[in-house]
Amino acid sequence: MALYEHVLLARQDISQQQVDALVEQFKGVLEANGGKFGKVENWGLRPLTYRIKKNRKAYYTLVNIDAPAAAVAEMERQMRINEDVLSFLTVRVEEHEEGQSAMLTRRDDRRERDGDDRPRRREGGFDRGDRGDRGPRRPRDNEAGEGA
């Protein structure tokens, strides 16, 4: 049997429990056709890069699959029929990754930060004094600063 990674995008207006039920439904379809589900990672509700079926957000779920191609094709057919599934992608891999995926690792790294990702800036207005290549400022000839 071949190894696959499958990412499922579910509508934003359903609950996480309904997403879990969807995954269980597709797990049943896959197992009925001789396949096995591996690791299941819920990435949560995330914004989409572009609208899909009038949705701006979706629940992302990653699933590792060990199944024959016919079982994966049947699962994908069922997903096309289901109105709660916005999109999906199945990729054949040589081996499944151990541990968390890169998406979950990135999310954990963000939680470890102090919440302020912006770089520190010096106090002051527009002139921060970081233009050492300029010489001293020329004095103005008149008070209003008009003309040259």
From Swiss-Prot:
Protein's GO biological process: translation
GO annotation, cellular component aspect: cytosolic small ribosomal subunit
SUPFAM superfamilies: Ribosomal protein S6
Gene3D superfamilies: 3.30.70.60
Region (Disordered): 96-148
Protein name in the entry: Small ribosomal subunit protein bS6
Keywords, comma-separated and alphabetical: Ribonucleoprotein, Ribosomal protein, RNA-binding, rRNA-binding
Lineage: Bacteria, Pseudomonadati, Pseudomonadota, Alphaproteobacteria, Hyphomicrobiales
Key word Ribonucleoprotein present: yes
